[in-house]
Amino acid sequence: MENTVLRTLEALKANRMEAYYAENKQEALDTVLSLIEKDNSVASGGSMTLKEIGLIDALKNHGYDYWDRADIKDPADYPAFFRKSLTADVYLSSSNAITENGELYNVDGNSNRVAAMLYGPKSVIVVAGINKIVKDLDEAALRVKTVAAPLNTKRLAKILASKVKVGDVIIKDILGTGIDVVAARSLA
């Protein structure tokens, strides 16, 4: 394990967080599942990391009480769902960046992850790859602007494009990146 990773793990612990290191996706999945009681209610923020390690599928397919926002069909129901998520026993998320000083850096469009981390469930589990480790808060902000926001913009543009109706146009500049989400779809 690299010195940077070790320093970051120790800094997270010094900041009163439990910190674990996993060699691979399966080990990460097993570690997270070991931290969740089977009878706990579980909610999560939108996170590719959680999907990539197989956590969302494991929760859905192995009897966990997982509250899945993908089940929401009407966008008007999202605010109520986000509020409900704050009452779950466990909240799962990732972070946009983690500093070597053990600081979690998050920028959210809906503030659901940040709200859950600060005011939500007693148990919040953050799953993040070592690619998210940065030196300090300045590098964290830069990572959001140059890596996380552009990737999320592309991912969310595809999702939005699949849900809009003819004539709908959605334009949003994400974090001043100059990358606009423009979603429109013709049903023809």
For each predicted feature, which ranges?
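N-terminal active-site beta-alpha-beta segment that forms phosphate/nucleotide-binding
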Residues: E2-F82, T87-L92
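Conserved phosphate- and dinucleotide-binding cores of soluble alpha/beta proteins
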Residues: L86-A188
